[in-house]
């Protein structure tokens, strides 16, 4: 009887300690397609080939976006101080796989949820020949140009 109690106590302790495992603060959070809303424009995130998830690595909080344009503008509009350290995940337009947005390659002629037109690719090779390819920095710069041209807010 004493051995059985000791065994049960051991199982409870093992279960308790396994719940204390430290999680990766940059890891993707579960996405609730067609229910999560874009933090900036409040549209429902349903397009699985243009979605963006930003992780604040300081506290592990996740933010969903329907278009990379909303992400870039949100960082600026909300004056997000932790933006340089943020982990930015974006879905590859061809595979739907989550990739690092800062190292992705972007083509510029896509129909995207908010019409910014940038689609992410894990490699340059997956972009059709003849299409313009830009990196994260150039794409970000162009988002502000598009926004300034199309909207009255000046960036």
Please report, for each region that a protein language model flagged, where it lies by residue:
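Bacterial lipoprotein signal-peptidase II cleavage site
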Residues: 21-27
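Short, flexible, mixed-charge glycine/proline-rich loop motifs
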Residues: 27-33
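Beta-strand-rich cores of mature extracytoplasmic or soluble domains
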Residues: 88-155
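Post-signal-peptide N-terminal segment of Sec-exported extracytoplasmic proteins
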Residues: 36-72
């Amino acid at each position: 009887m004493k051995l059985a109690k000791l065994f049960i106590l051991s199982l409870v302790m093992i279960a308790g300690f396994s719940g204390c495992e430290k999680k990766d603060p940059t890891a993707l959070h579960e996405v609730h397609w067609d229910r999560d809303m874009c933090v900036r424009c409040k549209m429902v995130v349903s397009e699985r080939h243009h979605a963006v998830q930003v992780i604040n690595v300081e506290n592990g909080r996740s933010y969903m976006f329907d278009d990379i344009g909303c992400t870039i503008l949100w960082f600026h509009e909300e004056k997000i101080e932790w933006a340089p350290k943020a982990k930015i995940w974006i879905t590859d337009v061809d595979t739907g796989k989550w990739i690092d947005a800062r190292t992705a390659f972007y083509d510029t002629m896509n129909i995207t949820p908010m019409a910014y037109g940038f689609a992410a690719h894990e490699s340059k090779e997956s972009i059709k020949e003849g299409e313009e390819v830009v990196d994260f920095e150039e794409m970000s710069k162009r988002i502000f140009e598009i926004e300034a041209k199309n909207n009255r807010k000046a960036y």
